[in-house]
Amino acid sequence: MRVNGYRGAKVGAVDTTSPPEVPASARLQRLAPMLLVVSILARLAWTYLVPNGANFVDLHVYVGGADALDGPGALYDYVYADQTPDFPLPFTYPPFAAIVFYPLHLLPFGVVAFIWQIGIIAALYGVVRVSQRLMGLQSQRRVAMLWTALGIWTEPLRSTFDYGQVNVVLVLAVLCAVSTTRWWLSGLLVGLAAGIKLTPAVAGLYFLGARRWAAVACSAAVFFATVGVSWLVVGAQARRYFTELLGDADRIGPIGTSFNQSWRGGISRILGHDAGFGPLVLIGIGITAVLALLAWRAIGGAQDRLGGILVVSLFGLVLSPISWTHHWVWLIPLMMWLLHGPLSALRGARILGWGWLALTLLGVPWLLSFAQPTIWEIGRPWYLAWAGLVYIVATLATLGWIAFSRKGSG
């Protein structure tokens, strides 16, 4: 046909009967509830149907240590060795943890283990939801289900389930402390978390950087209150922990195993002996501290609350003498922040986010553990030693990217 002297193109018939194509992300979100249920059932099946699916050794320590409170002077003499003959596991936590866990020893262990697993899943979902809230994405419940379903199979969560660890609950407590503006609630949550396990105390750096002085003071007061309660309940054992055992990394576990993803662990594997806090370890910590400070400033500190606590937590993980893979639960909110947060549109964010996801789903430190004859042997071939820096190097890359990505985008 001609219109004003021009020949128009033929227009084909428009199909109005076929439904529009649904994006893959939307299809996944529709399936989110089912995928979450399948993931949970698969995890429970792994625990109960696969030989050695989970040994709950740390949960045994929690329960056994709590039970030891009934025997005077026995808390820090207690060890669990039924499934770990090469390393009898002592109770390495503050005495307040034994008081908190005390009711657990009144129940059959099988019941405790099942409830514990459900609690881990609920806490993981809580971590995801609070992370979303901190990014202003609280309406995305189905996305939260997907992250929970996927997170169950990342290495930090796999080892949490295997050992029956408590770290997911502690991460949730710190995130809730960051998300609330109530100074007393922030202080209460951080203080209690640090009273159960010392590692959450690093969150105090976030509140110092955010100049939330009341929260800092309250968290310190609550922590010392847990010490006081412990002193009243277990007396000499509390004194023994805080004057003799605190800081004894050898008592916590083998420094050189690939599961220890801290600077001290990584440098020790390269040197072939425990590096302690020697020059190389201090240099590594110093470099990380500088990158963390630059990253903190780049995101405006506590203006990005999730980004801020992630920067602090990454620094704390490599600073600690021992950071087992189950300590790295912080990688779940980190991946969410990289892929959905305020910097997600910048070049490199998706590479880091998907890169962390690949590392944690593969479980690189776990794979490397098969190449070490025992957990106590520190020395190993150079390529395995350097490969054992995987989380540390990825942390440096992440902090460096946060520190300089905005400049690069400008």
From Swiss-Prot:
Organism lineage string: Bacteria, Bacillati, Actinomycetota, Actinomycetes, Mycobacteriales
Pfam families named among the record's database cross-references: GT87
Reported impact of residue 86 to A: No change in activity
Residues forming coiled coils: none
GO molecular function: GDP-Man:Man3GlcNAc2-PP-Dol alpha-1,2-mannosyltransferase activity; phosphatidylinositol alpha-mannosyltransferase activity
UniProt-listed InterPro entries: GT87
Free-text function comment from the UniProt entry: Catalyzes the alpha-1,2 addition of a mannose residue from polyprenol-phosphate-mannose (PPM) to a monoacyl phosphatidylinositol tetramannoside (AcPIM4) to generate a monoacyl phosphatidylinositol pentamannoside (AcPIM5).
Protein known as: Polyprenol-phosphate-mannose-dependent alpha-(1-2)-phosphatidylinositol pentamannoside mannosyltransferase
Primary subcellular site in the record, as a coarse category: membrane
Transmembrane segments: 31-51, 96-116, 160-180, 188-208, 214-234, 276-296, 306-326, 328-348, 351-371, 384-404
